[in-house]
């Protein structure tokens, strides 16, 4: 749900030179605007097999093998599903979660954006992982290993 209280109703026009990004990167794909219209983000290719996210002309510091599914959380943070060394996870404002999976998809948010969930697959098991603002995992079902405080623990 969009928080209309955070909108800047006074600004008449804001220009973000999105077209200029083409000259700064190999290519630009999947542009995605924030719900309040203040930010535009896109996946950018910086070199062969190296991708970043660019927000209002500023690139994330971290580089990833692949990136997709840009989404702004209700609290304004930008998330992306990212791949590092063939394993997938979620990056929030450029910082990747520690836990990696065979695949990840369908990022979802709590109403206030404090909790982020993503569907994941690991070793032919499918589940949903949810993470709160303190970094603790709230749910992890269907794996041979349990996640506690963001770390895998043998059962």
Give the ranges of each region predicted by the language model.
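Beta-strand-rich domains and repeat architectures in extracellular enzymes and scaffolds
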Residues: 3, 10-51, 61-71
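A short beta-strand motif characteristic of beta-propeller blades
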Residues: 16-23, 57-63, 94-100, 134-139
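Long, low-complexity, acidic Ser/Pro- and Gly-enriched intrinsically disordered regions
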Residues: 24, 37-41, 76-78, 113, ...
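Repeated scaffold domains used in trafficking and secretory/extracellular systems
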Residues: 24-32, 64-74, 101-113, 139-153
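Beta-strand C-termini and the immediately following turn/loop, strongest in propeller blades
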Residues: 41-48, 80-86, 117-125, 155
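Beta-rich carbohydrate-recognition and catalytic domains
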Residues: 46-47, 58, 92-95, 122, ...
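Eukaryote-skewed repeat-based solenoidal scaffolds used as protein-protein interaction platforms
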Residues: 119-126, 135-138, 142
């Amino acid at each position: 749900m969009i928080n209309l209280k955070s909108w800047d109703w006074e600004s008449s026009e804001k220009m973000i030179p999105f077209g200029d990004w083409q000259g700064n990167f190999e290519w630009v794909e999947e542009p995605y605007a924030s719900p309040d219209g203040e930010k535009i983000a896109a996946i950018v290719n910086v070199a062969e097999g190296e991708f970043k996210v660019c927000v209002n002309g500023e690139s994330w510091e971290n580089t990833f093998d692949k990136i997709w599914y840009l989404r702004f959380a209700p609290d304004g943070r930008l998330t992306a599903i990212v791949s590092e060394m063939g394993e997938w996870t979620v990056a929030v404002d450029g910082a990747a979660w520690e836990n990696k999976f065979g695949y990840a998809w369908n990022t979802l948010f709590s109403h206030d954006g404090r909790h982020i969930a993503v569907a994941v697959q690991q070793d032919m098991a499918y589940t949903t992982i949810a993470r709160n603002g303190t970094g603790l995992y709230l749910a992890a079902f269907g794996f041979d290993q349990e996640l506690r405080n963001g770390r895998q623990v043998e059962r």
